[in-house]
Amino acid sequence: MPSVIVIGGGIGGLTAAHELAERGFSVDVYDSRTAWGGKARSQPVAGSGTNGRRDLPGEHGFRFYPRFYTHVIDTMNRIPTPTGRVIDRLRETSESAIALVDEATWFRFARRRLAKPYEVVDALNLFFRELEFDPADVALFTAKFLQFFTSSDARRHGEYEHISWWKFLEGDLYSPNFQRQLRAVPRTMVAMDPAVGSANTLGSISMQLILDYAGTGVTNDRTMGGPTTEMWFDPWIAHLESLGVRLHGGTPVASLETADRAITGVTLRDGTRVHADYYVLAVPLDVVPTMITPAMGAIDPALERLRTANIDSLVSWMVGIQYFLYEDVRLVRGHLFYPDAPWGLTSISQPQFWDDLGLFRRRYGSGEVGGLISVDIAEWSLPGTYVTKAAKDCTPEEIAHEVWQQMKAALNTEHGRADDVLRDELLHSWHLDDDLDYSRGLPPTNTNRLLVHPPGAWSMRPEAGTAIDNLVLASDYVRTFTNLATMEGANEAGRRAANAILERCHAPTPKVPVWPLQEPEMFDVWKRLDDRLYRAGKKHVFELLGIRAAAQAGDLLRRFFAVTGIDKIDDLLDDTLAGELVDRVITRLARRPSE
């Protein structure tokens, strides 16, 4: 079988290597770091472990595995460990919570199973009622959210891709309090400003995350039962080596050579030249323009768009900090959101999920640390409350102080120290993401920024296969079903890169499976109806009927069920019948029901 060089040892590159090696290819992987896993790797705090204990586990940001992660989970299911498979090391989170400043309690929310489309309205109304938002805000938001649920894929890609999530939601019409939450939630979840992220991407992922709470079971919103490298990447690397993959850590690639519409070789930074039949470029978006030469761009317009792209306009920061505590503070059994925190914080208390590893203080550090709260910081351009500078303009010490104070403001009560959840004397030490480089002063350099999918970004993003005969791409900016810069998106991109090679060499092996995002069947009929409307140049049925509130949306869904007697269309329903159904239903639903 042919030989392959993979440039980049993150999830995209390792996935491509895994799939190709399983199919008999000769694979070499090169990465500038000695640690594998890219942004997802663990970052041990050097020198913190004593007397045989491991170093304290830092990270770029905590990892979570929601229900819609399919590709990553499939890969984990195929990586052996001494006692089973990597998938067995995932742990269910049973709840999440929102901590607001000046509130005596946190708002915990558990999952609720939804069976009918209009039950989404009831669930969202219940959730927002607990947070005491203005009913008018809740009514409009729920109606707009349900409009997205019931929009066809064609409308999402053709219309919503080109507007922001803020514009789709009509964000300017909400109260200042609700607007603050609308801005906070996408930032904390996926590091996106709703005024910048496309409605197609943010709507799709928001829908998946909402649906994650519309079901129960161990496949919902999971976390790893230990540090990511220890639990996942170490066994993955061992498995890749058992498949014959040769891994070259700490070996940066300097350049690619091109001739006759093909890559002819790779030059390493030490001057060594290496060759293969096929090449997988799996480096981050910040790095890929430096690897694409003008000659490569002349062959493939998609590569040229990447080479000349204004990367700063496409990316944002989401960076993690970990607080090591003398005692464990469990908070909630899941993720905790801080909508009032100006720096867009989300956290998880991790040792409660690591019980199988034994007592935390016996395994990590000096024996003094018993707790770990891992925090993601999603907003780096707004001033803090206590330091009053943007995070980018702060020293690491100032960042650690500000984030700690923002968490205390949300978690502690007004009743005084006896009731405080976080106390300064609990804090042993902290670790800030190693990928922030302060060597040149402030602001730091961040080489692991996230693609934020602004409106129209899909047209800039390349397919996995390029116009260069033996070059494919495997990173989270590649076009995928996932359509989000995540571990899932990177894994799917790696699979698509492997498939592109399989097609080009006419390999007699099975293709690597890729799967679209799954949506509940209860919305099928609505999406089919909207597809007809969109292709006829008409607006969504909610807009045609002037529906602007959740109660109206719920009433429409209930009346549709009463008119048609169905809540999904059989797969055998042809386009003619669907078209007739559109006209009939719109005509009847437009009439006011008799009293």
Predicted regions and their residues:
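Active-site-proximal substrate-binding core of FAD-dependent oxidoreductases
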Residues: A500-D555
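Conserved beta-strand-loop-beta-strand element in the redox core of flavoprotein oxidoreductases
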Residues: L256-V274
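Dinucleotide-binding Rossmann-like beta1-alpha1 core, especially the glycine-rich loop
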Residues: T50-F141
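Glycine-rich FAD pyrophosphate-binding loop
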Residues: A21-S48
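N-terminal Rossmann-like FAD-binding beta1-loop-alpha1 element of flavoenzymes
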Residues: P2-V29
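C-terminal auxiliary extensions adjacent to catalytic cores
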Residues: E543-E595
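Active-site/ligand-binding neighborhood in enzyme catalytic cores
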Residues: F141-A259
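C-terminal segments that line or cap access tunnels to active or ligand-binding sites in enzymes
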Residues: A214-R222, A276-Y278, V283, V287-R461, ...
